[in-house]
Amino acid sequence: DSMNDLVQVKKKTEKSAMKLILAVGKSMPYPAAFDEQGDIRYMMRFRPRGYGFFPVANDRFIVMERQTLLPTPLIPHSTQMYEMDYLGRVYRTYYVPNGIHHDVCEMTPGGNLLVASNSQCGHVEDCIAEVNRETGKIEKVLDMRKIFGTAYRDRTNWVHINSLDYDSSKKQVYFSARNIHTIGCIDWKKDKLKWILGEKNMWKERPFSKRASSTYCDSG
């Protein structure tokens, strides 16, 4: 009942392009879908860890467990995530020992998962992990220190990976990193930076810039 008036229509112009919007987060602690009138049409009585609800293939999604937490120098991170359907049925449970934060995405429909994770070596939110979809095994962990070196590694949360996406045709990972003001592309097989979109004064004359096609933004 407390969610009945959670979404309020303040202004409406024309018919919405989307029948339903699925959301979860701070003020909406349970995954829920609402229509263009702001009416809740679907809700799951499972409260995930605050980073959200990640749709994957076959009308399923990944959610992070909020009770199984790993202490970090920043905030506790979940170490467990579930593959669920919209009826709340759990198909798989995955354990990521160094913790999960911010984003999870499929590499291919039904394939392995890319997870924003942590090095736990005095730093957090600085790694990308690949999780085997069938076995749950951690197939690979890429520490962003390998990509950017240590020039900016001057605080606990030096990268702060926010989002991930994967291009299966090119074997490339796209990422956004808040604390180094960058969107970038990495060759996932070779662990090489392909390009960056970032602030010019931050990245010019850096060693890796010679092997990356860089696009700079004028902060003005």
Regions found by a protein language model. Name each.
Residues 1-220:
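Histidine-/acidic-rich catalytic cores in large beta-rich domains
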